[in-house]
């Protein structure tokens, strides 16, 4: 899938720079010195009136966090302007939950990465399990969307994860490895070092089952080894956990060696819960 360049006649402002992991060598990377990142994924929730209070509360709470805890929210695309208006100048960056694989053209309903960047956004989630399941997004399509995000100056949050059937079949590493490899194959080492990867075990979301911190860490360690094979700088990519993180399990999860934070769903819709998760991330940085 090939996309053409930006539309003629559009003057584009550079996208906001997303907070990046520290630039360390591979040996340092395998330590626990990476900064934490907590990103809220609102999914298809929100309205202008309710969003304002939530965004303002999160911005106020984030101001009290240590510098090595980074915070973001990925809102529905119609609320990008509101997020920019209320969060600009705060510690919180903003983004979207999906982008088009195309840069422009007759693609009704699609939103191009560069359009998102026009709102000084930092993040674009790509390959979320709900997109893969409900919209039949392939690993190849996710890889192309990752490229589009990087070209627009956005930081793609690349989601990978396995279903319950795949986990019970012992195929977890094979599944997430293929999903990640498809993306890495299209990127240079320099480009790959600019992504964020989120592991979301589909089997642990809404199934009554839960992933232990040890299970989550095992997959994160595998993903980091896969990233390291791309290059020393890529080994330092931020790895988020996205399997129903809540205030009561966040600190244990974030204390794991290769878990650098979380991609937060339902809990990101309540400012107290979301900020409690951010504070849990801060507690783990203080302990290292």
Task: List the predicted regions and their residue ranges.
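Active-site loop-to-helix "anion-binding N-cap" substructures in soluble metabolic enzymes
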Residues: 2, 7, 12, 17, ...
